[in-house]
């Protein structure tokens, strides 16, 4: 198809102007696999790191993770903290829900002795603490759990039944304007956990929305929709969840990709199981019947035993992880091609919110 050279020139000029004004990566072609050269922190899941395009969550940005109850939101953020601490980074957890379990966090690999934790009384206090930590330049990762629990001071001091229309949204809007610039300067990753609410009277499209108004949706560089898709059983006992995460917004790489992994109760993300699955899909690990082999050596009969072998041999697991990252991050499309046809449908996009449903 012939393209008008004047239009092509005008498009190049406006794209250059937009990127100059709003930053590199603020606009790109949907089919581009280009990712920005940004520092990232692993999410704890290889497939999610690949789906994000840059190899993890970007530093100096705002990230929103939302989903239904018990879908793995807090577990995912604790995995991010554990990964950051392994790199020697300082992390803080703003526990607005007053529900953080330090024993569970420790099981996921979080160094609780060096994790800063705050349980603020009001939403304003929580956001001021975030801003102070950000401006200090000494904290690398801040988690806020959750936006729905950031209650404005006026609402706390008022009575139950009082109307406070738009108060939380105004508070979040003001905080986002203040935080966004400081985060970039200090290279701090700020992750907000959010809950889902239903819009009343929606006949068509996605009735789901998130709390706290629209400011967070706008300022977030990455938005992740996390869902529990099934149960993992050992006999009759449920031992974990099958989890799917959709990247519904991404300003550092192409959006709308998705990742699937397992979250095991008391253990977190099943990394070795993920390595086995992706290794087989990309022919790094050979599978003959029920036996799995790596470089000609048998590593286990059945997926669980192969995963156990990798857990007991971290050097081999790290080697497979490194090879898969190099392969998949250079060609992110390979991740989706390894999924089964029924799990790889394109889905529908709500262009008002950027959500896939």
Curated annotation (Swiss-Prot):
Pfam families from the UniProt entry: RecA (PF00154), RecA_C (PF21096)
Residues noted as binding ATP in the record, renumbered to the chain: 67-74
GO molecular-function terms, A-Z: ATP binding; ATP hydrolysis activity; ATP-dependent DNA damage sensor activity; damaged DNA binding; single-stranded DNA binding
GO biological process assignments: DNA recombination; DNA repair; SOS response
Localization (cell): Cytoplasm
Domain of life: Bacteria
Transmembrane intervals: none
Keyword annotations of the record: ATP-binding, Cytoplasm, DNA damage, DNA recombination, DNA repair, DNA-binding, Nucleotide-binding, SOS response
Function in brief: Can catalyze the hydrolysis of ATP in the presence of single-stranded DNA, the ATP-dependent uptake of single-stranded DNA by duplex DNA, and the ATP-dependent hybridization of homologous single-stranded DNAs. It interacts with LexA causing its activation and leading to its autocatalytic cleavage.
Family stated for the protein in its record: Belongs to the RecA family.
Protein name (database record): Protein RecA
The species this protein was found in: Shewanella sp. (strain MR-4)
Gene name for this UniProt entry: recA
């Amino acid at each position: 198809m012939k393209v008008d050279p004047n239009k092509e020139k005008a498009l190049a000029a406006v794209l250059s102007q937009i990127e100059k004004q709003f930053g590199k990566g603020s606009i790109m072609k949907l089919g581009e696999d280009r990712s920005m050269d940004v520092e990232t922190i692993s999410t704890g899941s290889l497939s999610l790191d690949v789906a994000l395009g840059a190899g993890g969550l970007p530093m100096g940005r705002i990230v929103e993770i939302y989903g239904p109850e018990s879908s793995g939101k807090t577990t995912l953020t604790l995995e991010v903290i554990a990964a950051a601490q392994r790199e020697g980074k300082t992390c803080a957890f703003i526990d607005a829900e007053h529900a953080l379990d330090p024993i569970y966090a420790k099981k996921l690999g979080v160094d609780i002795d060096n994790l800063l934790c705050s349980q603020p009384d009001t939403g304003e206090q929580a956001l001021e603490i975030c801003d102070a930590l950000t401006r200090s330049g000494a904290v690398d990762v801040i988690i806020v759990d959750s936006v729905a629990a950031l209650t404005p001071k006026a609402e706390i001091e008022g009575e139950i039944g009082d109307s406070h229309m738009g108060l939380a949204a105004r508070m979040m809007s003001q905080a986002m304007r203040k935080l966004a610039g400081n985060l970039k300067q200090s290279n701090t990753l700020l992750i907000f956990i959010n809950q889902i609410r239903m819009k009343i009277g929606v006949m068509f499209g996605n009735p789901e929305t998130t709390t706290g108004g629209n400011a967070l949706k706008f300022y977030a560089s990455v938005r992740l929709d996390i869902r529990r898709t099934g149960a993992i059983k050992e006999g009759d006992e449920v031992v974990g969840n099958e989890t799917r995460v959709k990247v519904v917004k991404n300003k550092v790489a192409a959006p709308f990709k998705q990742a699937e992994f397992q979250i095991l109760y008391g253990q977190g993300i099943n990394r070795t199981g993920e390595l086995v699955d992706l290794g087989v899909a990309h022919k790094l690990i050979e599978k003959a019947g029920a036996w799995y082999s790596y470089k000609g050596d048998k590593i286990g009969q059945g997926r669980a035993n192969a995963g156990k072998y990798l857990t007991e041999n971290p050097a081999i697991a790290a080697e497979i992880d490194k090879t898969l990252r190099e392969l998949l991050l250079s060609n992110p499309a390979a991740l989706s091609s390894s999924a089964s046809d029924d799990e790889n449908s394109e889905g529908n996009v709500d262009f008002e919110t950027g959500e896939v449903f």
